[in-house]
């Protein structure tokens, strides 16, 4: 009895730790940053000259260096649907008869053996045979569909410039309304050529995009099941 209680407690704590880890990963999305940004560099005006070697006179005001900012226009929409159907049928029959047995007739030259109480006596011919049939049917159907959409705007910081010139960006936004916190996190890689003249870029052009939109507060708590229900769902075998 003690072993059973100990095993149940171990399963309970493992399931609880798993749930807490999943919640912690979502809430701490983007914290700390995956990439470590370089410290900002102060620009010092050149003495005796109006020319700055940090930027070109005809350079666009677009993000291209570490700690530069770029605005991401998030407009993600996904839709998937899959249908599967399987039908299988199998029908077989078997009929075997024995005519000779080691060169002898199956009646062993004994005729007129009557069948009395399940045994052959005089009056019937011994003629063994095997006959059987089998039928198997299977049918299965499945249908699944999923749709998701997220829109918004977030300004990200360039945290790294890759050797090929692509920019690694990362951003995190928190909005609190009536003790309800909404967290929007975005990470990814963009090309400088995809940035518009207004220093904006569509989320469709973000490679390896990781977009998290989670909420914390009373509404979020009401939308999630209690810890005991989640634990029972994990161990319930039926």
Curated annotation (Swiss-Prot):
Family: Belongs to the FlgH family.
Lineage top rank: taxon: Bacteria
Protein name: Flagellar L-ring protein
The protein's assembly and partners: The basal body constitutes a major portion of the flagellar organelle and consists of four rings (L,P,S, and M) mounted on a central rod.
GO molecular function: cytoskeletal motor activity
UniProt cross-references to Pfam families, sorted A to Z: FlgH
Keywords: Bacterial flagellum, Cell outer membrane, Lipoprotein, Membrane, Palmitate, Signal
Coiled coil (residue ranges): none
UniProt gene name: flgH
Function summary: Assembles around the rod to form the L-ring and probably protects the motor/basal body from shearing forces during rotation.
Organism: Thermodesulfovibrio yellowstonii (strain ATCC 51303 / DSM 11347 / YP87)
Membrane topology: Lipid-anchor
Record lipid sites (N-palmitoyl cysteine): 17
InterPro entries: Flag_Lring (IPR000527)
GO-annotated cellular components: bacterial-type flagellum basal body, distal rod, L ring; cell outer membrane
Subcellular location(s) of the protein: Cell outer membrane; Bacterial flagellum basal body
Region forming the signal peptide: 1-16
Biological process terms in GO annotation: bacterial-type flagellum-dependent cell motility
Lipid-anchored residues (S-diacylglycerol cysteine): 17
């Amino acid at each position: 009895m003690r072993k059973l209680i100990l095993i149940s407690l171990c399963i309970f704590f493992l399931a609880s730790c798993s749930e807490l880890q999943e919640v912690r990963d979502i809430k701490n999305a983007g914290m700390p940053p995956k990439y470590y940004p370089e410290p900002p560099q102060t620009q010092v005006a050149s003495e005796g000259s109006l020319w700055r070697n940090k930027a070109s006179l005809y350079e666009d005001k677009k993000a291209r260096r570490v700690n530069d900012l770029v605005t991401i226009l998030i407009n993600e929409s996904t839709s998937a649907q899959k249908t599967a159907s399987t039908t299988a049928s199998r029908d077989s029959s078997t009929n075997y008869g024995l005519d000779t047995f080691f060169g002898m007739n199956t009646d062993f030259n004994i005729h007129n053996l009557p069948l009395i109480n399940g045994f052959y006596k005089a009056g019937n011919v011994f003629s063994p045979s095997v006959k059987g049939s089998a039928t198997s049917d299977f049918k299965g159907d499945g249908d699944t569909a999923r749709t998701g959409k997220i829109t918004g705007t977030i300004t990200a910081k360039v945290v790294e410039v890759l050797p090929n010139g692509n920019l690694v960006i990362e951003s995190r936004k928190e909005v609190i309304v009536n003790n309800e916190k909404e967290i929007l996190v975005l990470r990814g890689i963009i090309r400088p050529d995809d940035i518009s003249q207004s220093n904006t870029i569509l989320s469709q052009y973000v490679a390896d995009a990781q977009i998290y939109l989670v909420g914390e507060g009373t509404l979020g708590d009401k939308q999630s099941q209690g810890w005991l229900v989640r634990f029972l769902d994990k161990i319930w075998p039926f």
